[in-house]
Amino acid sequence: MKRLLLILILTFIFQTLTKADDISSITIEGISIGDSALDFFSKEDIEKNTFDFYKIKTFVPVQMNKFDFFNTYDAVDFNYKAEDKNFKIVSIDGVLLIRDPIKCEKKLDQIIIDITPILEGNHEIEKATIIHDSDPSGKSKIVEKQWILQNGDRVLVQCYNFDVNYNSANNNLSISIRTKEFHNFLRKIAYKDEA
């Protein structure tokens, strides 16, 4: 039953991709890229749930857990530009807390099977394991599959497997929707030391 529900949710979330030129029509818990976070959360809640993950402060990460309107995910993470007083969302993740890396990767593989036909026609990057740049030890990993839309925006399905000695981060499965600009920041700039 849970698998059927997940398939239906993923189909609903991603059904517009084949018709859309960008990702603003895709939603996670009713929230889209380009929406103001203030339409869903109070300024106080946003500020209270803001974290300081990135060395370069171009974007602000926010992690929202267990809000009443969350039906599918345990948490919703999003980012907005640091100077943006409207809190316009440039990335959004639906997060499921799956602590066991083997179970997480099984779920990831099933989601990949389920959504690949929906994302057909977009550039596909094979599933890979990468080192999480925020962990200086190099022991925290991300297993991921990506699709790149024509304008460079991305859809990713990821398992985050954090080293037990790294912070208090929780292993999780994430379905991520990102603008090209934010993805490039996250992968190339966010965890680098300022020059």
Model-predicted regions and their roles:
Residues 4-15:
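Sec-dependent N-terminal signal peptides
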Residues 21-61, 91-195:
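Non-cytosolic coordination micro-motifs
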Residues 57-72:
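Secretory pathway targeting signatures of secreted, lumenal, and periplasmic proteins
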Residues 69-83, 153-166:
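Broad, structure-driven detector of short, well-ordered beta-strand segments within folded domains
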Residues 81-95:
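A basic- and aromatic-enriched beta-loop-alpha substructure that forms the phosphate/nucleotide-
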